[in-house]
């Protein structure tokens, strides 16, 4: 390694067993939610594929206590996610995805900013999603 140490700026540490996070002093956050393979099968290219039982863990609305009032005032939400290593069939481990609705506060959908704290990531995003019904 080159000796570079990444400073996350917040005392949140990913843990592997059980998958999740620990929060340090002055940090708030909810109980971690674990997404299992069975939970996301419908979103996968091959819903019958093999892969890690625990695919990822997520904690939404985390932050420093000193910023809590400001985050709420600005309607900002900070979340953390950790993923299992491996594949889901032929595709990389990933989340099940989601759609952002238009915020009545701002008039636009919620932006997302990603920081990769360790490892490598592929981030796939699409600008628009539409539901199509097929009548048989």
Regions found by a protein language model. Give the residues of each.
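Active-site region of the double-stranded beta-helix
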Residues: 23-132
């Amino acid at each position: 390694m080159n000796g570079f140490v990444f400073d996350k700026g917040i005392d949140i540490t990913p843990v592997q067993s059980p998958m999740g996070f620990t929060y340090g002093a002055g940090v708030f956050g909810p109980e971690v939610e674990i997404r299992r393979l069975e939970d996301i099968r419908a979103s996968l290219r091959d819903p019958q594929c093999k892969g890690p039982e625990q695919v990822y863990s997520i904690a939404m609305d985390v932050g420093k206590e000193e910023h809590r009032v400001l985050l709420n005032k600005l309607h900002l939400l900070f979340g953390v996610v950790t993923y299992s290593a491996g594949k889901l069939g032929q595709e990389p481990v990933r989340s099940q995805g989601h759609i952002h609705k238009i915020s009545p506060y701002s008039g636009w959908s919620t932006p997302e900013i990603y920081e990769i704290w360790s490892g490598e990531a592929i981030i796939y995003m699409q600008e628009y999603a539409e539901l199509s019904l097929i009548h048989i």
